Amino acid sequence: MLKKFFDITVVIIFMPLIIIFLILISFYLLIKQGKPIFFVQNRVGKDNKSFKLYKFRTMEITAEEDFHKSHYLDLAKGKQVEPTNSPLEPIRIENDDRITITGAFLRKASLDELPNVFNVLLGDMSIVGPRPLVDYESELYGDYNLKRCSVLPGITGLAQIQGRLDLSLQER
C-alpha cells in the first residue's frame, strides 16, 4: 500500500513535466512517423496477470514481432546467434533496421518508456520493479518467473541500472 502511494505521489508530482514531454514527443512522432504513435503490447505482470503495456513506437509499422520472438527463443535455447555467436549474447539485436532514427534516440534516452506512467496510474506497474515480460519470455523463466510475478513490474529496476539490454538472459 505504501509503495502504491509512493508511485502515485511521484507520478502526480512530476505530471506537469511528464505531460509536456508526452505532448512534444507525440507530436514529433506523428509528424515524422505518422500513426500509430504508441506501441501497445500484452505483458505479464503481478500474479501472472496479463496487461497492456504502453510505449512510444520506435520501430517501423511493418516490423514483425515474430522476429524478436525467434531471436529470444534461440538465445534461451543456447543457440549461437549473430553477431558474436555466443549463447551469452545480449538480448539486443545489433543494427536492427526495424528501429527508426527517432526511435533509436527515444530508446537511448529511455523516453520510449514514458507512457508507462499510464500503467502506473492504472495499477498495472510500479515505478521500480522487474521489467514486465512478454508472455513467451515469462514461460522460459520457470520458477524464477513466480518470484518476478510476486511484485508489480516496474518502469525501472535492477536490470536497467546494471546494463539494460546489454545483459544476457543468464545475467538478467
Task: Give the location of each predicted region.
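Conserved small/aromatic sequence motifs within transmembrane helices
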Residues: 1-14, 18, 22-172
